[in-house]
Amino acid sequence: NVYQYRKMLQCAMPNGGPFECCQTHDNCYGEAEKLKACTSTHSSPYFK
């Protein structure tokens, strides 16, 4: 649930929040997409 997710984020990132976590995650995928070895049939880690 959302409460447990928030507690997990507080444990891993005590001074951060869900928006910072999601931004870091998205930036990581953005950089990985630039690597030839990391390309796939999907242009995004999120299925549309």
Curated annotation (Swiss-Prot):
As cofactor, the record names: Ca(2+)
Q: Which reaction does it catalyse?
A: a 1,2-diacyl-sn-glycero-3-phosphocholine + H2O = a 1-acyl-sn-glycero-3-phosphocholine + a fatty acid + H(+)
User: Could you tell me the EC number(s) of this protein?
Assistant: 3.1.1.4
Which domain of life does this protein belong to? Answer: Eukaryota
Q: Keywords in UniProt for this one?
A: Blood coagulation cascade inhibiting toxin, Calcium, Disulfide bond, Hemostasis impairing toxin, Hydrolase, Metal-binding, Platelet aggregation inhibiting toxin, Secreted, Toxin
State the compartments where it is located. Secreted
GO terms for CC?
extracellular region
Q: Which residues form the active site?
A: H25
What does the cofactor field's note say? Binds 1 Ca(2+) ion.
Q: Name one GO molecular function term.
A: metal ion binding
What PROSITE patterns does UniProt report for this protein, alphabetically? PA2_HIS
Q: Which residues bind Ca(2+)?
A: D26
- Describe the protein's quaternary organization and the partners it interacts with: Monomer.
Please report the name of this protein according to its UniProt entry.
Phospholipase A2 TI-Nh
Q: Which organism is it from?
A: Naja haje haje (Egyptian cobra)
